[in-house]
């Protein structure tokens, strides 16, 4: 099958959405499919407000239509709700072609955190974007339930996986800091709720690995915390493995792939009992979910690294890719090319 994936999130961005899509694309190719990823790199772009490191395609509709017509896909997946996602939606609707979408990010909650607008406004925009899709792929049962509450009728559960070869237990001497070492990995932005972690009264050390618009301010506000940026996945894997506990303070993530990567490295998780952590950790003895995040972090130190590793191995990317294929809506008959 010829599969077009349209996404506003792609390399060199470093986030969970990019990792999911890049890994998915590789697995689909391994399964014998032809995959075309259409991303902002092929377009003139402008910086995203509040996220200048994220480029947004500028007026992409015509060029995107030409690219899709030339590729002649058998199925189209719109991975994000940015300019390219809307342009892909317009292309499919103009040709009366089915498509799928994905709900990777709780943009309504991010927008409310920045502007204070009621959640109903951005959720209305999200319903409009995803409404015509044959299926809206969401990464967990919790998010699926939330979308149903907001009036989505076409959402389906599509879990994520982890590369247990890349992320695995390693010696902890990579980091020379007082123990225990409490780690956060990910974007350093307001929606990640990092002050909830960095303000905790914990023994040992707190380490943040990642970059983002809130990094400089948090470094000034929490001078006793340590901040690093990983140079590639191999180094990132060593940071994970060096930790004693992975602290995930976000209340707005749809999944939290970094938790799986930590578990694959044999490191237990402390988090709030919200969507994302509830779906990755559940009732397994590989993490502690508690509204008292400090208590969760201390309790997680007693959990088994081997149990963490075994739990992560349940999340297979091969299964994720095959499930994705089952959700696609292939076109009936050959695609008739149309001028943009």
Regions found by a protein language model. Name each.
Residues 215-234:
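Nucleotide-activated donor-binding/catalytic signature segment of Leloir-type glycosyltransferases, i.e.
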Residues 173-207:
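Conserved donor-binding/catalytic core segment of Leloir-type glycosyltransferases
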Residues 68, 130, 238-243, 324:
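Short alpha-helical donor nucleotide-sugar binding micro-motif in glycosyltransferases
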Residues 302-337:
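A charged, aromatic-enriched C-terminal amphipathic alpha-helix characteristic of glycosyltransferases
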């Amino acid at each position: 099958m010829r599969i077009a994936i349209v996404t506003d999130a792609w390399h060199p961005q470093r986030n969970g959405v990019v990792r999911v899509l890049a890994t998915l694309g590789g697995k689909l190719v391994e399964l014998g499919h032809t995959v075309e990823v259409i991303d902002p790199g092929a377009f003139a772009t402008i910086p995203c407000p509040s996220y200048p490191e994220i480029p947004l395609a500028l007026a992409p509709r015509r060029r995107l239509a030409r690219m899709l017509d030339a590729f002649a896909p058998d199925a189209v997946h719109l991975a994000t709700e940015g300019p390219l996602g809307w342009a892909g939606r317009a292309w499919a609707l103009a040709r009366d072609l089915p498509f799928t979408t994905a709900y990777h990010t709780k943009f309504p909650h991010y927008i409310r955190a920045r502007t204070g607008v009621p959640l109903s406004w951005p959720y209305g925009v999200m319903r409009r974007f995803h409404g015509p899709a044959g299926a809206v792929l969401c990464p967990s049962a919790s998010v699926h339930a939330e979308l149903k509450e907001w009036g989505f009728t076409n959402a389906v559960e599509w879990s994520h996986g982890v590369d247990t070869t890349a992320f695995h237990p390693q010696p902890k001497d990579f980091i020379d800091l007082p123990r225990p070492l409490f780690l956060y990995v990910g974007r350093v932005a307001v929606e990640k709720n990092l002050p909830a972690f960095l303000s905790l009264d914990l023994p040992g050390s707190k380490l943040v690995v990642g970059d983002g618009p809130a990094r400089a301010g948090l470094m000034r506000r929490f001078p006793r915390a340590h901040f690093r940026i990983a140079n590639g996945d191999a180094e990132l894997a060593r940071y994970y493995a060096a930790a004693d506990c992975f602290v995930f303070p976000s209340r707005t993530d749809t999944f939290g792939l970094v938790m799986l990567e930590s578990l694959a490295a044999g490191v237990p998780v402390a988090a709030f009992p919200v969507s994302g952590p509830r779906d990755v950790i559940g009732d397994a003895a590989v993490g502690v979910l508690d509204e008292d995040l400090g208590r969760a972090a201390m309790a997680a130190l007693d959990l088994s690294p081997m149990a963490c590793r075994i739990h992560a191995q349940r999340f297979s990317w091969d299964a994720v890719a095959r499930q994705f294929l089952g959700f696609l809506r292939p076109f009936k008959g050959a695609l008739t090319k149309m001028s943009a």
